[in-house]
């Protein structure tokens, strides 16, 4: 069974049990995820959202198919009261363009809640609003529309956290025990709550709770092993003008939303998750959600980091991939670390195209189990179901056509369909694939390695240096009228041509000669498919002796 379906089943069982025991008022599975809008959130952060989305989608299917009579919600929280801990090297504007941050004077906002830091581009009310907008727009581009978005800043103002804040003061001794067990570097009287200083706007450690207010002195605090400067202000603020520290805020969110299921990365498993379970049960009197730990993945062999600047957000990757292909990447087993190598992204696309063929019965997996898995993986990542198998242009071929023909590439695809006398490639899908594969070539193929047709003068020099047997085959090939044939027919003609020569070893030399005459390289795209896009005069001039 697909991993998301297994988790969906667990969530349904949990809801049924909680409802029967009177712990919840309605049978509703709450699938939750969240992010801190600290900058451009990369595709590794998408793990939270997409893993949760697949489980949500599986439960939704159960409801639509009348397999369960409950409800399901998909909730995302923006942890916008988290402090600005460091300045990302690059930040993205609302037009999805990256900018250097070094000259923007943002250091003065370190230690302030993200919801109180100004938007560096002046387009939104705050830093957090800006980067949450960029993040959510990327998610919607994937076809994920059902997500309810909540902001911690609003939840604090509305008093949603009050019950949990008061609980940590009422159970100070128990909190101290938990601190000793999980946070050895903290002192015995440590209180996991910070006030927002009304004078300088930074988060500051507090002294005590007095009814619904907290006393504090703004002496700064340590963030990521760095001390932020406080202004020295002494006073009181309402508890709604503060923030639970992460280990205590996360379990409080579980309680606020009655969270049934939540995925998280392995970094939280060893720390926050283990302490969070204790805090949930012993401080807040709630049960933690069903957990799901996923492994991080690398991009180009490296871990992404906003502070280092090697970040790829959803919008970046959707320049080179269709949304369904990117979603497919997240269907793979989450406990295994994977490396998304952008220079070889065609491998992922080819894999998706093959899974699509398996879904529509045009191909089979190596085993029955693999076939069933492939069908389910495809089904859960596709947002639009087709009435028949989509006829997609192969990615590498699309890249080749885009590099050589540019905007006229779609015309070559249409000519190919016309020659074949049938629709080999769907027009709308071909336009999208040509755009994505063309962007990929421009962004990730070094200029010297991109494909282009060499000029006649260079081709003539290469032709003169060829073996006479190869020249003879090329002359015959040029006279075969292949310009009127489909790619499949051209492949057959080449096979017949080599066979008629009586020397099978000429096959490699023939293909190599064709690539050299076309591109000045011994390798290239599938030859027959590309020749199918060429006109008669070009073929004769390039392959036939004058």
Language-model regions: role of each:
Residues 56-59, 63, 139-146, 172-179, ...:
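A generic secondary-structure signal for well-formed alpha-helical elements
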Residues 1-26, 41, 64-69, 73-75, ...:
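Basic, alpha-helical terminal appendages of large translation-related enzymes
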Residues 268, 273, 283, 295-442, ...:
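Catalytic adenosine-cofactor/nucleotide-binding cores of aminoacyl-tRNA synthetases and other
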Residues 35-43, 259-265, 498-502:
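A short glycine/serine-rich beta->alpha loop
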Residues 32-39, 251-258, 492:
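Short, conserved helix/loop micro-motifs enriched in His/Cys and acidic residues
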Residues 1-176, 276-278:
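N-terminal Rossmann-like or analogous alpha/beta NTP/dinucleotide-binding catalytic cores
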Residues 43, 85-87, 180, 207-209, ...:
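Short, solvent-exposed loop/turn and secondary-structure capping segments
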Residues 145-315:
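Active-site cores that bind ATP or allylic diphosphates and position pyrophosphate for catalysis
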């Amino acid at each position: 069974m697909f991993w998301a379906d297994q988790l969906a089943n667990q969530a349904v069982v949990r809801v049924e049990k909680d409802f029967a025991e009177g712990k919840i008022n309605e049978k509703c599975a709450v699938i939750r995820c969240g992010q801190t809008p600290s900058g451009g959130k990369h595709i590794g952060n998408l793990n939270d959202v997409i893993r949760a989305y697949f489980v949500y989608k599986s439960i939704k299917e159960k409801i639509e198919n009348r397999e369960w009579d409950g409800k399901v919600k998909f909730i995302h929280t923006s942890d916008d009261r988290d402090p600005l801990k460091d300045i990302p090297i690059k930040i993205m504007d609302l037009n999805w363009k990256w900018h250097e941050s070094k000259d923007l004077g943002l250091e003065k906002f370190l230690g302030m809640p993200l919801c109180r830091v100004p938007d560096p581009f002046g387009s939104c009310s705050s830093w957090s609003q800006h980067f949450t907008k960029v993040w959510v727009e990327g998610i919607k581009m994937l076809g994920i529309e059902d997500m309810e978005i909540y902001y911690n800043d609003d939840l604090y103002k509305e008093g949603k956290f009050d019950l949990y804040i008061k609980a940590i003061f009422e159970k100070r001794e128990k909190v101290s025990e938990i601190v000793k067990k999980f946070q050895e570097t903290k002192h015995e009287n440590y209180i996991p709550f910070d006030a927002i200083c009304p004078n300088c706007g930074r988060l500051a450690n507090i002294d005590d709770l007095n009814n619904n207010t907290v006393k504090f002195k703004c002496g700064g605090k340590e963030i990521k092993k760095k001390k932020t400067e406080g202004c020295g202000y002494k006073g009181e603020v309402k508890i709604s003008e503060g923030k639970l520290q992460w280990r205590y805020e996360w379990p409080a969110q579980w309680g606020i939303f009655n969270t049934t299921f939540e995925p998280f990365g392995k970094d939280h498993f060893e720390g926050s998750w283990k302490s969070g379970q204790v805090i949930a049960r012993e401080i807040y009197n709630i049960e933690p959600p069903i957990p799901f730990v996923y492994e991080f993945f690398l991009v180009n062999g490296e871990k992404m980091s906003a502070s280092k600047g090697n970040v790829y957000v959803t919008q970046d990757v959707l320049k080179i991939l269709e949304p369904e292909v990117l979603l497919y990447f997240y269907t793979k087993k989450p406990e295994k670390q994977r490396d998304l190598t952008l220079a070889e992204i065609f491998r992922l696309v080819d894999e998706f195209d093959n899974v699509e063929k398996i879904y529509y019965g045009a191909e089979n997996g190596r085993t029955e189990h693999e076939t069933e898995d492939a069908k389910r993986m495809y089904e859960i990542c596709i947002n639009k179901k087709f009435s028949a198998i989509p006829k997609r242009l192969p990615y590498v071929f699309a890249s080749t056509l885009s590099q050589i023909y540019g905007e006229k590439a779609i015309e070559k695809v249409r000519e190919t369909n016309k020659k074949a006398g049938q629709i080999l490639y769907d027009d709308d899908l071909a336009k999208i694939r040509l755009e994505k594969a063309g962007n990929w070539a421009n962004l990730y193929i070094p200029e010297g390695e991109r494909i282009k047709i060499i000029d006649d003068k260079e081709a003539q020099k290469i032709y003169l240096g060829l073996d006479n047997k190869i020249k003879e085959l090329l002359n015959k090939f040029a006279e075969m009228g292949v310009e009127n044939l489909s790619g499949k027919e051209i492949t057959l003609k080449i096979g017949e041509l080599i066979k008629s020569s009586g020397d099978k070893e000429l096959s490699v030399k023939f293909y190599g000669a064709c690539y050299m005459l076309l591109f000045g390289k011994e390798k290239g795209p599938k030859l027959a498919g590309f020749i199918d896009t060429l006109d008669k005069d070009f073929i004769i001039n390039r392959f036939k002796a004058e």
